[in-house]
Amino acid sequence: MKEYVSPAPDAPSVVLYGRTAARMDEVVRLVRDLGGVSAYGAFTEEELFARIATVPRLRVVLFGGGIDAASRARARAHLAAHAPDVTVSEPGFGYPYSDANIAADLRARLAAAPPSGPTPPR
């Protein structure tokens, strides 16, 4: 599973930026199980940047462990320029890596972050 769209009409969204399909599936399911949250996966920078531009109510981008430092830096720069209200979760870097810690960090970020997403057309 690469994506889960919550049936809740105002569900916040998380973009998962990773390299491994099996782990992406596990983390999408973890986000789904938080309840009332949508999850969208991205395997490449291009896909990540497209998700940042189009995902509704984007609140958090989660970097997987396989994302190298240079790609993380480019992603952070893109977020700063295009979605400055979106926060970054970095399991294994910002906090100890475990599903329980990922869920706890996402819950905290989703509770604290303002809604964000693509700018509506004018």
PLM segments and residue spans:
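Conserved acidic segment of CheY-like receiver
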Residues: 11-21, 61
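Conserved phosphotransfer microenvironments
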Residues: 63-79
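N-terminal, charge-rich interaction modules
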Residues: 1-13, 82
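Ser/Thr/Gly-rich flexible loops in soluble cytosolic domains mediating phosphotransfer, phosphorylation
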Residues: 81-122
